[in-house]
Amino acid sequence: MKDSRTDEIAFEAARLMESNRAESIGEAIRAAASALGYHDVDLPGHGRVRKHVQGLAMQALGSEGYARSVSDVWRVAERIMTVLAEAVPDAEPLLVGRAAQGLIDGGVTLHVRVYTEASIGDVAQTLVDFGYEEPGFETAATRFGRLDRLRLADEGIEVLLTRCPPNVVGRSSVDLFSGKPVSTATLAELRRKLA
């Protein structure tokens, strides 16, 4: 039997995310359970919280406003992917994850892969040359080994760009960490969604 308190935690966590009072979904879940005094209850999954965040966003913005928000996020992705495709000779950018589906709830982070032989430093310099702020450099330990990443923001939207050497990471629709299927959108597909 499902415990309705689990859903109460999910809803409260969504409210915390929507009001920017939590840095991550995990933090929001823990804070919500604590605030409600539910210490012996199964915690909700991240997906359940995201559904509540999406519902709150649609309630606040209306369906047209939510659709505009999705388009705004896609435009940020399209701009950075266009810069990469046109300015880095062999680059093939790919939007991955929930944003590729148009799900922009819970403090969206755009996950962009760029398949290229160019160094992460060259990719970063290209972005700076095109007016982006200096990105932060990171490394991720994935199923394919250690991959270089850039973290930056555009119009208040966080972008996490992962450089994928084509000879190491095949172009695929799988999560780099879990190997599970993940939604993707090429630049051409993204442009069709925006048309």
Q: Over which residues does each language-model region extend?
A:
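Catalytic core of pol beta-like nucleotidyltransferases
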Residues: 2-107, 116-195
